[in-house]
């Protein structure tokens, strides 16, 4: 019996992670159903990542890596790059990195250039010569962004003042909690409901007397987030601690906000002066 239904995707994953004998078979079907599903590309990427994290056979790993290419997802490109060092998965991984990177000039950076050069050196299939030429052409056309790096470092002054770097542009090592919804993308931390998960992100380390510096931008109307302080994990920071609003309050859905709900307010406690936002995408 073969069932073609999105409803079988999660049960297959549960079988794969609870039954070692059926893991490969279940994950192979899990990948096929995910690929054919109505999920958005971000959700599909999350499923392929979960399949890889379950450590299946090389064949299933290669199927997941190949499937990631169709998501055209930045995180997928970076995840696939990690599999280029394993000879058994190198070809599938290299092809996926190439198929994503060369279709997205906006992803290009010094780090992505290095990845593409590694892809060029890794590819060995019948079309490798043509693929290398495509990579060379892409790199040549995007020289203007070669100096752009996704890596962030503390300045000498910040180090002297005792600041700690919580996010360097590519890894989430300082964080715990909802690491599925908060993802490193092109040097910044990106969060969207389209990943299909909910919950808060927390620093692993607790801080008492601190200064937190960060920049942000909204990529769509009505974004609602916040910075929680003095809050336990696993609860609503706005009610069990303090939540400083990060809110695109110009959106029509927020027309009736009270003064202690606008951006910059400590929600329900300390009101902030309401500002007028600039265009979406402005930091």
Put a short name on every predicted segment.
Residues 55, 74, 92, 122-123:
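Long beta-sheet-rich domains in secretory-pathway and surface-associated proteins
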Residues 2-3, 29-32, 67-70, 96-99, ...:
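Core register positions within helices of long alpha-helical scaffolds
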Residues 5, 18-20, 56-57, 85-89, ...:
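Short inter-helical turns and helix N-cap capping residues of alpha-solenoid HEAT/ARM repeat scaffolds
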Residues 4-16, 38-52, 62, 73-84, ...:
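Amphipathic alpha-helical scaffolding segments comprising HEAT/armadillo-like alpha-solenoid repeats
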Residues 23, 27, 61, 77, ...:
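Residue-level detector of extended alpha-helical repeat arrays and alpha-solenoid scaffolds
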Residues 22-25, 32-35, 95, 236, ...:
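Beta-propeller blade termini and top-face loops
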